[in-house]
Amino acid sequence: MLNEFIAIRRDLHQIPETGYKELKTQAYLLDYISKLPNEFLEIKKWRTGILVLVKGTNPGKTIGYRTDIDALPITEETGLPFESKHAGNMHACGHDLHMSIALGVLTHFASKPAKDNLLFVFQPAEEGPGGAKPIMESAEFSEWRPDTIYGLHIAPEYKVGQIAIKPGLLFANTSELFISFKGKGGHAAYPHLANDMVVAASAFVGQMQTIISRNIDPMDSAVITIGRIHGGEIQNVIAETAFLDGTIRTLSPETMEIVWTRLKQLAKGWEEAYQCEVEFHPGSDYYQVDNDPVETEEFIHFLEEQYPESYVPARSAMTGEDFGYFLSEIKGFMFWLGVDSEYSLHHAKLSPKEEAIPFAIDVLVNFLESK
């Protein structure tokens, strides 16, 4: 018989929705939660997200657990019998597993409440435009604001049954990068009468990498990646405009500031050199995931005692997660959950091993009961 929460994961996998459009997802979650024993539950909606408070038997504090619920604009290529029914969208970052795990933990405590209050945060828009900071600033969250908060993220590179975590920095600071170039278009045969923005943007892509190699301490780390470039409309017309979309990743806010300062200085030089206008457009910024050392060491000790084969020391990663906003104000941690997939996060063929779901539920239930 299929595990109940694996079945839930498969249901959610079929209805992926992007940030703040998670209407079917929210409805599915609310329908499930409404059928749980409600003696100890209070439920609030926030935009397309949900907050659920499980009242403790003798509460002295509130412990938070956060899961993200949104998907990515990726066309699925897994060929699974339960693949996405929403063309162009896919749960390619494992948020379907995250939700099913959270529901499993919530189901346990709805019937057997812990001593302290538990707050379950089903957060929208992690992939963008960013839901953590707005939900933290909401009246709904503020009323039930937890004293500690935890979260997880699936990790294709680890085996099922493995949990990777470390004190301190786990995920990087991230900043979305959107740049437009505006020059002067013209006939392809007369480049001297135009200002070619394909040339300007292409040169900028290469030059910005010198920020990493020549402005960042070699013992530090930073990444600038351009994932999309678009310029012009037809092959025989010099492009009047060009656009670069990318991301910046750093291990500290200070390094992020250096990168942005140099990018803007570089852009001023480009305007002079290529006789164009260079403009930066706002995107999402994610704060680093910085695990509280005391909370993390407590969890590591718990794993070593209860799941001695599971703990794996993690390394800091350049991935980004807006859970960092929670940890910037509330002590807690995030960990990697092994799902053993040959394809990476954000890949159209990502296919996590579902056995990780009941394992994670068991670990989290036992850990929260030990608090």
From Swiss-Prot:
One GO biological process term: lysine biosynthetic process via diaminopimelate
Keywords attached to this entry: Amino-acid biosynthesis, Diaminopimelate biosynthesis, Hydrolase, Lysine biosynthesis
Record-listed E.C. numbers: 3.5.1.47
Catalytic reaction(s) noted: N-acetyl-(2S,6S)-2,6-diaminopimelate + H2O = (2S,6S)-2,6-diaminopimelate + acetate
Enzyme active site: D68, E127
SUPFAM superfamilies found in the cross-reference section: Bacterial exopeptidase dimerisation domain, Zn-dependent exopeptidases
Recorded metabolic or biological pathway in which this protein acts: Amino-acid biosynthesis; L-lysine biosynthesis via DAP pathway; LL-2,6-diaminopimelate from (S)-tetrahydrodipicolinate (acetylase route): step 3/3
GO molecular function: N-acetyldiaminopimelate deacetylase activity
Protein's UniProt keywords contain DNA damage: no
Amino-acid biosynthesis keyword on record: yes
InterPro entries, per database record: AcetylDAP_deacetylase, Amidohydrolase, Bact_exopeptidase_dim_dom, Peptidase_M20, Peptidase_M20_dimer
Top EC group: hydrolase
Family statement: Belongs to the peptidase M20A family. N-acetyldiaminopimelate deacetylase subfamily.
Reported function: Catalyzes the conversion of N-acetyl-diaminopimelate to diaminopimelate and acetate.
Name of the protein this chain belongs to: N-acetyldiaminopimelate deacetylase
